[in-house]
Amino acid sequence: MRIISGKNRGRQITAPSSLPVRPTTDMSKESLFNILNNYFYFDRVVVLDLFAGTGNLTYEFASRGALSVTSVDNHQGCADFIRRTAGKLGYSQVSVIKADAFVFTKHCKQQFDIIFADPPYELADIEKIIDNVFEHNLLKPDGWLVMEHSKAHDFSQHPQFYQHRKYGKVNFTFLVNMTDNSDSSEEEEEDQEDGR
């Protein structure tokens, strides 16, 4: 995986092959951050990275100067790898929590500007993550929840739905903590996938 922008732009990170992960592709990650860049100043955001895996998104947010990034994964190997890598890269704003994302989002008391969730595509009931985020008020006003998912899921009828983007086999649904979603849109972008 590669850090696309920020102080560690171009840095390649190789995760152990033993980790049970499916990292977000560089192409889809770059497209995602191009969208976020239009709405957020990264040096002002507080981020939660759920199902963090190798920490791919965690490092990208940290490289771009995020105020803090909380990285949550239930796999000990993943949590240890993120902690080591963040330390090597000097990301003091990164905190790593080994926890089940469903349980964590039920009990977390902090609010975030951006929450990114990349559950395993085959995982059942991933909509519970969305429910937990909004029921437990984990987003700041105008904060965003970004769900990465397969085409099997459609969250366009959720009251906080904002937009949907597709890059190859990667789907992103954006949900926003706001009361007026009149500008919600469904956008499809078909691109070649470059691997995760």
Language-model-detected regions and their locations in the chain:
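Class I S-adenosyl-L-methionine-dependent methyltransferase catalytic core
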Residues: 1-196
